[in-house]
């Protein structure tokens, strides 16, 4: 293998995206993994996307990432979530075949000519004069590189807990990275401990699906990737059941057998993915909690018991699972477990995800205190692009909070740090009406093309689609709809009032009871129009006022973002700042006045003082 320019440690969702991005930009990359058979592994839930997370997948795809394509290639169920809410918060979710997803990602990795995979434990970093210049393998072999990206997931000093039993592991059946974790602490990177976990898996043949509610997903599967024309695959249903009174009694009577409550686990758990013990202890008034039985794939009967994540003893887990209706005879294939691991506080990172203390060292994924496949993949892509740009002498690749959910996430991480596992949600984005799933390509595809990660033909197809949308919107604005029986029948049948004067097609569509499908019925939009195109037109027209308002807010936001703060700006000379606020600003080292405004604790008066000092 040729010597690498970039080394990536870890071949999970972050590592794969980082490696693929850098290799596709023409740099020689080595991707380290403990086991080549676990490249792109889904170690927890067999799904991609969700509220907020689906937005990330679409953005990753628009920038040339691989996650959306791998999900499309392994999809066994599709759902649009949040359909009762507005378009800004709706998200796509795919149930995936766990094995096929991993194989699709491995195939993508192995097809890249500039990318080499190495099955080996990385025991340490080579750091010389404040710069990371390579890695040291467990064998003692040293490999030099211009940049190193750590995408180590839960492997840094990982410890698995099942009841009173605990043992070192990065994942079930895999060794942890103890030496690397110690070195990061010795290098002065601010480290902490988080806790996550995974539910039990059961043998599908032992589950009584007839006793559960079937969830068959949506009839039409919409691809995540612009590069997927259509998805024609076998589909599988999920099934819903609920915990019982017996389930709750078992947990309450055995709470101290959980390391989460006995004091053995010190790591902070994820707020939005609580264990069963947490749900029952924190919400005693709840009579039941949902349990979703999800298929693991087409080639196995194994099912994932979403909602039953716990760290109770293995023998107690059998009784616990069998207390749930439909699981009375269930055979556990893999018990649930909790895992503690080291993370690095991301406030020590630059916006590029390079560490401030050590040049050439980038961190991506769960090592930065995040939770979730999609969050990890987005960071991996971001770090891979920026490491490549640094080596090639190009400007950093930065998206801001008004560009993308990726920009929101990275800004949150590096500006505010984390005190619990960070999970993306639509509520984190101030400009979410502008950052919808359906316009991810409008926002980011040209950037992906400029990076060399999106082919010309993909851009051409999207440009044609955008021109068609603009032409149809212009046609609606030009057409006049006059009161008549056909029009008023549509309006009244939807619960609206008759129109009494001529309206443009645009004003007619703005009425809450009118949809794009009604315009097709009336001949105002072409019959057979693509449903996604019709939906995009409807959103643009109905939400025009709100969208314009958010665009004005973005203009004000960008005015502050344009005011850059030098790397060596002296916050000690700013009058009126408290000592605590000075320390926070010096720790974060905001790159702009806009970023400074989001540092926890900063007030409008403090921001004005910084601005005045900057002008001096």
PLM feature spans:
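Internal hydrophobic alpha-helix adjacent to the cofactor/substrate pocket in enzyme cavities
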Residues: 376-397
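Core beta-strand elements of the Rossmann-like FAD/NAD(P) dinucleotide-binding domain
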Residues: 138-147
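Beta1/beta-strand and adjacent pyrophosphate-binding region of the FAD-binding site
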Residues: 2-14
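Extended, charge-enriched "interface" segments that sit outside catalytic cores
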Residues: 428, 436, 445-602, 606, ...
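A glycine-rich dinucleotide-binding beta-alpha-beta segment and adjacent secondary-structure elements
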Residues: 304-370, 398-411, 530-584, 589
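An anion/pyrophosphate-binding glycine-rich loop and adjacent beta-alpha core
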Residues: 35, 182-318, 326, 415-488, ...
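Glycine-/small-residue-rich beta->alpha transition segments that form the dinucleotide
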Residues: 147, 152-156, 312, 325
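Conserved N-terminal/central alpha/beta ligand/cofactor-binding core
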Residues: 20-128, 139, 151-171, 175-180, ...
């Amino acid at each position: 293998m040729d010597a690498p320019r970039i080394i990536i440690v870890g071949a999970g969702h972050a590592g794969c995206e980082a490696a693929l991005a850098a290799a596709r930009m023409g740099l020689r990359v080595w991707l380290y993994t403990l086991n080549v058979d676990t490249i792109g592994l889904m170690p927890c839930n067999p799904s991609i996307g969700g509220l907020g997370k689906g937005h990330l997948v679409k953005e990753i795809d628009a920038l040339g990432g691989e996650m959306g394509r791998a999900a499309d290639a392994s999809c066994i169920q599709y759902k649009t979530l949040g359909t009762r809410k507005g378009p800004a918060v709706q998200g796509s979710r795919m149930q995936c075949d766990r094995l096929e997803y991993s194989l699709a990602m491995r195939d993508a990795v192995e097809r890249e000519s500039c990318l080499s995979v190495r099955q080996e434990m990385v025991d340490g970093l080579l750091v010389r004069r404040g710069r990371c210049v390579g890695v040291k393998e467990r064998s003692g072999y040293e490999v030099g590189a211009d940049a190193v990206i750590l995408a180590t997931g839960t492997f840094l000093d990982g410890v698995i807990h099942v009841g009173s039993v605990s043992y070192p592991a990065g994942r079930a059946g895999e060794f942890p990275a103890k030496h690397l974790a110690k070195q990061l602490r010795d290098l002065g990177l601010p480290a902490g401990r988080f806790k996550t976990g995974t539910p039990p898996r059961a043998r599908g043949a032992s589950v009584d699906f007839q006793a559960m509610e079937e969830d068959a997903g949506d009839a039409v599967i919409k691809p995540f990737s612009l590069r997927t024309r259509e998805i024609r695959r076998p589909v599988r249903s999920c099934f819903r059941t609920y915990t019982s009174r017996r389930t709750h009694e078992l947990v309450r009577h055995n709470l101290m057998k959980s390391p989460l409550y006995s004091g053995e686990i010190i790591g902070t758990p994820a707020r939005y993915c609580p264990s069963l013990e947490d749900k029952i202890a924190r919400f005693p008034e709840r009579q039941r909690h949902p349990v979703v039985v999800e298929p693991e794939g087409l080639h196995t009967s194994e099912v994932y018991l979403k909602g039953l994540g716990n760290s109770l003893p293995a023998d107690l887990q059998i009784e616990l699972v069998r207390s749930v209706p439909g699981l009375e005879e269930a055979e556990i294939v893999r018990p649930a477990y909790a895992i503690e691991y080291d993370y690095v506080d991301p406030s020590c990172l630059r916006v590029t995800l390079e560490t401030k203390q050590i040049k050439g060292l980038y961190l991506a994924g769960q090592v930065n205190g995040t939770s979730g496949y999609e969050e990890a993949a987005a960071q991996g892509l971001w770090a891979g692009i920026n490491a490549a740009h640094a080596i090639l002498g190009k400007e950093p690749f930065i998206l801001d909070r008004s560009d993308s959910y990726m920009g929101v996430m990275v800004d949150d991480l590096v500006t505010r740090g984390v005190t619990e596992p960070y999970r993306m949600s639509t509520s984190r984005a101030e400009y979410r009406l502008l950052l919808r799933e359906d316009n991810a390509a409008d926002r980011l595809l040209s950037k992906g093309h400029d990076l060399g990660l999106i082919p010309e033909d993909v851009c051409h197809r999207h440009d044609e689609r955008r021109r068609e949308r603009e032409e149809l919107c212009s046609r609606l604005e030009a057409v006049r709809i006059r009161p008549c029986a056909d029009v008023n029948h549509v309006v009244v049948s939807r619960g609206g009032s008759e129109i009494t004067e001529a309206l443009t097609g645009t004003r007619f569509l703005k009425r809450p009871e009118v949809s794009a499908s009604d315009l097709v019925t009336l001949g105002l939009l072409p019959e057979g129009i693509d449903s996604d195109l019709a939906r995009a037109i409807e959103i643009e027209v109905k939400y025009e006022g709100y969208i314009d308002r958010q665009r004005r807010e973005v203009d004000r936001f960008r005015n502050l973002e344009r005011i850059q703060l030098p790397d060596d700006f002296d916050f000690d000379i700013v009058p009126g700042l408290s000592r605590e606020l000075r320390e926070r600003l010096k720790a974060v080292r905001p790159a702009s006045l806009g970023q400074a405004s989001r540092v926890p604790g900063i007030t409008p008066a403090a921001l004005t003082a910084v601005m005045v000092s900057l002008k001096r």
